[in-house]
Amino acid sequence: MSNFTAEDKAAITSLWGKVNVEDAGGETLGRLLVVYPWTQRFFDSFGSLSSPSAIMGNPKVKAHGVKVLTSLGEAIKNLDDLKGTFGSLSELHCDKLHVDPENFRLPGNVLVTVLAILHGKEFTPEVQASWQKMVAGVASALASRYH
């Protein structure tokens, strides 16, 4: 059962078709690591995260940001089954990476900020509401396999 209306789905997919995954992914993960510095502990293997400029210029941050948004693209194709889409990622983050599920909401909120910056007037309050619903659904799906 989906909580997404036809209008939500249209708003999400329409904007997603205009998103440059490379630009938005790097910006989103970079901002996450700057704004919420405690999240850096999950990315020890990324090299220097010593300053905002080091983080924003770090190629591993950009590459992982692309990976995250590519996964999000899969979610957008499967809005009616977010838990199924993210089942294996939920298990990975729980069992192997030991990420506190409270952290799952942070990247989505940062992404919404990045989309607002990159898409300006096109990112209307209605579009934002649909995206907030979607990133909340993704965070919930990522936390679904925790025990």
Curated annotation (Swiss-Prot):
Tissue expr: Red blood cells.
Entry GO MF terms: haptoglobin binding; heme binding; hemoglobin alpha binding; metal ion binding; organic acid binding; oxygen binding; oxygen carrier activity; peroxidase activity
Pfam families reported in the protein's UniProt record: Globin (PF00042)
Keyword entries, A-Z: Heme, Iron, Metal-binding, Oxygen transport, Transport
InterPro entries membership: Globin, Globin-like_sf, Globin/Proto, Hemoglobin_b, Hemoglobin_oxygen_transport
GO CC entries: blood microparticle; haptoglobin-hemoglobin complex; hemoglobin complex
Keyword presence, Transport: yes
Cleavable signal peptide: none
Superkingdom of origin: Eukaryota
Any coiled-coil regions, as ranges: none
Occurrences of domain Globin (ranges): 3-147
Cysteine disulfide partners in this protein: none
Residues reported in the UniProt entry to bind heme b: 64, 93
Keyword Heme in record: yes
UniProt GO BP: hydrogen peroxide catabolic process
Family classification: Belongs to the globin family.
Biological role stated in the UniProt entry: Gamma chains make up the fetal hemoglobin F, in combination with alpha chains.
Assembly and oligomerization: Heterotetramer of two alpha chains and two gamma chains in fetal hemoglobin (Hb F).
The protein, known as: Hemoglobin subunit gamma
